[in-house]
Amino acid sequence: MDLNTILIIVGIVALVALIVHGLWSNRREKSKYFDKANKFDRTSPTSRSHTQEEMVQPNNISPNTYVENGHTPISQPTTEKLPSEAELIDYRQSDKSVDDIKISIPNTQPIYDMGNHRSEPIQPTQPQYDMPTANNVASMTLEQLEAQSQNVGFNGINSSSPELRVQLAELSHEEHQVDYNLSFNEPKAETTAQPKQTTGYIQLYLIPKSSEEFNGAKLVQALENLGFILGKDEMYHRHLDLSVASPVLFSVANLEQPGTFNAYNLAEFNTIGIVLFMQLPSPGNNLANLRMMMRAAHTLAEDLQGVILTEEQEIFDANAEQAYLARV
């Protein structure tokens, strides 16, 4: 009886020990699993970065390299070489940016670059033309003169003048009758040419249409809009490149004595008129500068409701304009 009791007690103790050992073993296995899981989370940024890099090129990835549902991979790691970070960067940078794109036509060189290119501003230059002399004009045919006038452009000779066309036709007819073996030293027939003005001043007056006077504020605004600068002798000057350091092409003076503009009272004064004048010889081309002064006079007349007069105080019409141009 005592032996049976002892065996029962020993069996119960053994059973309890087995149960306790089983529970303890189970908890230890769970503890190891969670430790590994926590360790994977701590290193997961690197693993996730490799996973994202692998997903960029899915054709080169083995299914064994993915981690599913937070579990560690069961299979052995593959020996396949993953793309390095430098190679991945080169791959991502292989696409050209918009600035590198060039538009071109087939079988031709690129004609336009989409990149941001800043070109230096082109400074305006005063065109210089070689004006033909009177002797050269006399020796030209009408067709040659018209061709040269088209090449010269704005500063060319006005070949539409009836008198000039008649003279050229007569000279051309005479030259065709002369032997072509004549020496260049032989005297040529002199042509009557109007003498050009090379010194002095060319002037244009601008007065109001009515008996009223020009308002100082409006006059100053109109002059400044045309690029005039108040400078030497208290007059407005039109410079070559709109800076006081460049030469003066033509100027504007007040008709009232002493002909100046008070810099400290420009907004309050009135005047009966102004005079535009150009001194010869002028910087650059006299004819081009005279045309520019005429355009400025016409613009001022429109802005200020004025009338342009010649030096003889006559209306500056088309005939007077041609006479002015013929002077230079």
Swiss-Prot record:
Residues 39-79 are annotated as: Disordered. It is found in: Cell inner membrane. Signal peptide: none annotated. It is a single-pass type I membrane protein. It comes from the Bacteria. Residues 57-79 have a biased composition (Polar residues). Keywords: Cell cycle, Cell division, Cell inner membrane, Cell membrane, Membrane, Transmembrane, Transmembrane helix. Residues 26-328 are cytoplasmic. SUPFAM superfamilies: Cell-division protein ZipA, C-terminal domain. Residues 1-4 are periplasmic. Its main location: membrane. PANTHER family: CELL DIVISION PROTEIN ZIPA. Essential cell division protein that stabilizes the FtsZ protofilaments by cross-linking them and that serves as a cytoplasmic membrane anchor for the Z ring. Also required for the recruitment to the septal ring of downstream cell division proteins. This is Cell division protein ZipA. It comes from Haemophilus influenzae (strain 86-028NP).
